[in-house]
UniProtKB/Swiss-Prot annotation:
Localization (cell): Nucleus; Cytoplasm
InterPro entries named in the record: Velvet (IPR021740), Velvet_dom (IPR037525), Velvet_dom_sf (IPR038491)
Domain notes: The C-terminal PEST domain is a region rich in proline, glutamic acid, serine and threonine residues that is required for the light-dependent regulation of development and secondary metabolism.
Keywords, comma-separated and alphabetical: Cytoplasm, Nucleus, Sporulation, Transcription, Transcription regulation
PROSITE patterns: VELVET
GO-annotated cellular components: cytoplasm; nucleus
PANTHER family: DEVELOPMENTAL AND SECONDARY METABOLISM REGULATOR VEA (PTHR33572:SF14), SPORE DEVELOPMENT REGULATOR VOSA (PTHR33572)
Name of the protein described by the UniProt record: Developmental and secondary metabolism regulator veA
Chain segments carrying region Disordered: 1-23, 41-60, 258-361, 491-524
Taxonomic lineage: Eukaryota, Fungi, Dikarya, Ascomycota, Pezizomycotina
Organism the protein comes from: Penicillium rubens (strain ATCC 28089 / DSM 1075 / NRRL 1951 / Wisconsin 54-1255) (Penicillium chrysogenum)
Amino acid sequence: MANRPSLMPPHNETEHSVSRITREGKQLTYKLSVMQQPERARACGAGAKSSADRRPVDPPPVVELRIFESDPANDTQKTDITFAYNANFFLYATLETARPIAHGRVGGPQSCPVLTGVPVAGVAYLDRPSQAGYFIFPDLSVRHEGRYRLSFHLYEEIKDAKDADKDSTLPLPNQIPLSATSKPGIPQAFLHFRLEVKSVPFTVYSAKKFPGLATSTSLSRIIAEQGCRVRIRRDVRMRRRGDKRDEDYEFGEERAAAYARSSDRFTTPDRYAASMDRPRSNSNGSNIESPYGFVPPDRRPSAPDYGFQCPQPYQRPMPPAPMSHSQTPSYQSHLSFGSTPSHYPAPHMPPTPPPVAPQGIYSPQHAYAQIRHPSNGSEYEGTPIAYPAPQIPVERGGYPKPPMSSYAMDPPKPNSYMDPRMPEPSLYPSTPNVPVSRPQTPNLPAMPPPKPLSNDYANHVVPSVECTSPGGSGGGGYDNVRGKRMVYQTGPTYGKRSHEDTFGLDDRSMQNGMRPDTEPYPAYRDFSGESRAALMAEMGIQLSYKRANGKIVMKAPPSST
């Protein structure tokens, strides 16, 4: 540190000049001017990470050097020889406090210098803003906060003997004997101190109180354009004192707003926000996914859309019509909530298709008669051909009367859904019947009068649609469209309990020796997943009889064990 400054501004603040007489009798005048004063700085501290967090003094100090030559007798006529003068110059910067500080008697020297960075600058001869020599200090930092000023010291290395001082006794570089060059310790060049200039006081702030950095000055830009290394900032980094949110950041509100706009632009939009307002369907059948991955395009209107309220607590969907291999299904949805099939479009049939179900509004009993289920006989070996479901008059409780030459018609099963997405029949060969458990009412047996089965069922093949409940196994590997048994089986979905578990088993067929007045339904082999033909072939036709109410009942022979 240089001499302690006084309370009054020093005489060499901002500008200072000094003159000397050379050996040739000429007068040289050196003039230093602080062209760009330091204004603010952020304290970088003295810890281990201080070097990584250094903030330079802003704006960077710039000192101008000019050299004039004149006659010692006439000082008014001076010639600027800054560019023509042959010598080496450098400027050394030191830091001193703007106010004198009274130290104690036992106060030791400072452990580390307060000024850090690059305190030495060489001269740069520039044409702008004017032809002169400039010293730039772009990397000066202060460790502690306070009020300081910079002091710049000019040193010169003389190259020509004619430019040496008149009364100087120091040898010139070209006058040093060559024999002495090999001896260590003998200087080969000498530096001459010329003058000192001081900057105006500036403030060093702590990290929390630092107001920020301003844009680069025009002088810094001009110097940088000529090849000097000066940091240029084209945006304002000043921070408002009342804004506590940006205390720990260097950019202000403008940069924060720009950052927020850029972050909002890359935010992923919420595509599912509007799906929360979608009204819920009247059925829970849509919650069950299909195992085949086909989703119909849209949903068929439910029963309230037709103005018809279904009286049953559980509503039954309508099965789809079978389609040919070369046609696209024209149905709208796999859901039907007990409504009539009047809006069900006619399916595409093979050549010469029979007429489809007539249009019109039907009662719920007619809707029951239109539902098809797995038929008996040799449906696994025949080619699946689509037949429309005939209208059957309803008798006694809404159960259809079974025809002698058609497939069975069953009453509706509660809480069921259908799956129109089926694979091609050629992909799955015919396999033996696999028993599958299904917690719903078994199909009402529809059997012809006692006679050989091959005469009635062998030549009649009807594709059937199997309706399963959400609590069931979802078809048990049965092709609902083609009428084929599939190799694989789908797992149970574990849904609601069936209608029989709640309201009893009165409508179920009597099997394994059961009687209507005996104990509840015992544990037995579940034939609901098998075809009627396989069941009758296993039990025998002689055990089938008609009840008094007109129902055909199959009775298992008594067990031999």
